[in-house]
């Protein structure tokens, strides 16, 4: 089984914020692949289904971002899922809005959700970095906790990620990125 983790903060007040773009992708994948309704488990909202030929558990930690690692550790430990079979979808202020990059391992670039996951399971999991841009002025935390100006474009990108997710899960990272870029340009 694969573990697909969408990072975000719980609560309606954070629903449309840049920091919750991982939740948007997780919800979109769950809908697009007809996963059952999310249930509370492992300090998270969890749903298990299939993404193409891949059995997958989608996890949305119910803790705040800086404690996401606890939920990931619980789910991964219970199902004996190694870090290499975990993919985390998260906001990245170092990328322009709408840019998507994928990598395995590496540093957390100051992202508290990734820092928490690194401390819990190590850093060899996959990361799908979802660009939210940096503010021209003001604090970064204020920026990522503010709402998107164009939430429709975020939802469109989430659907493109979902539509091409089997490429990524099949190990074709370049094909996945190529399709996202091509689709996103249209």
Curated annotation (Swiss-Prot):
Site feature: Stabilizes the basic form of H active site to accept a proton: 91
Catalytic residues of the enzyme: 19 (proton acceptor)
Reactions catalysed according to its record: an N-acyl-L-alpha-aminoacyl-tRNA + H2O = an N-acyl-L-amino acid + a tRNA + H(+)
Gene3D superfamilies assigned: Peptidyl-tRNA hydrolase
Keyword Transferase set for record: no
Binding site for tRNA: 14, 64, 66, 112
Pfam families noted in UniProt: Pept_tRNA_hydro
CDD domains named in the record: PTH (cd00462)
Places the protein is found: Cytoplasm
Enzyme class: hydrolase
Main localization category: cytoplasm
Keywords tagged on the record: Cytoplasm, Hydrolase, RNA-binding, tRNA-binding
Alphabetized HAMAP family for the sequence: Pept_tRNA_hydro_bact (MF_00083)
Subunit description: Monomer.
Annotated NCBIfam families: pth (TIGR00447)
Function (record text): Hydrolyzes ribosome-free peptidyl-tRNAs (with 1 or more amino acids incorporated), which drop off the ribosome during protein synthesis, or as a result of ribosome stalling. Catalyzes the release of premature peptidyl moieties from peptidyl-tRNA molecules trapped in stalled 50S ribosomal subunits, and thus maintains levels of free tRNAs and 50S ribosomes.
UniProt-recorded name of the protein: Peptidyl-tRNA hydrolase
């Amino acid at each position: 089984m694969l573990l697909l983790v969408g990072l975000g903060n719980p609560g309606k007040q954070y629903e449309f914020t840049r920091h919750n773009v991982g939740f948007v992708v997780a919800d979109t994948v769950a809908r697009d692949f007809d996963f059952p309704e999310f249930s509370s488990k492992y300090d998270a909202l969890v749903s298990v289904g299939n993404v193409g030929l891949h059995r997958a558990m989608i996890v949305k930690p119910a803790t705040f971002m800086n404690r996401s690692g606890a939920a990931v550790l619980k789910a991964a430990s219970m199902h004996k899922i190694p870090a290499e079979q975990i993919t985390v979808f998260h906001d990245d202020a170092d990328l322009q809005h709408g840019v998507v990059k994928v990598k395995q391992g590496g540093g957390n670039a100051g992202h508290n959700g990734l820092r928490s996951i690194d401390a819990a399971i190590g850093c060899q999991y996959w990361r799908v970095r979802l660009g939210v841009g940096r503010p021209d002025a003001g604090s970064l935390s204020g920026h990522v906790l503010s709402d998107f100006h164009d939430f429709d474009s975020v939802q469109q990108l989430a659907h493109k990620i979902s539509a091409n997710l089997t490429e990524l899960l099949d190990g074709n990272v370049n094909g996945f990125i190529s399709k996202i870029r091509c689709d996103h340009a249209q």
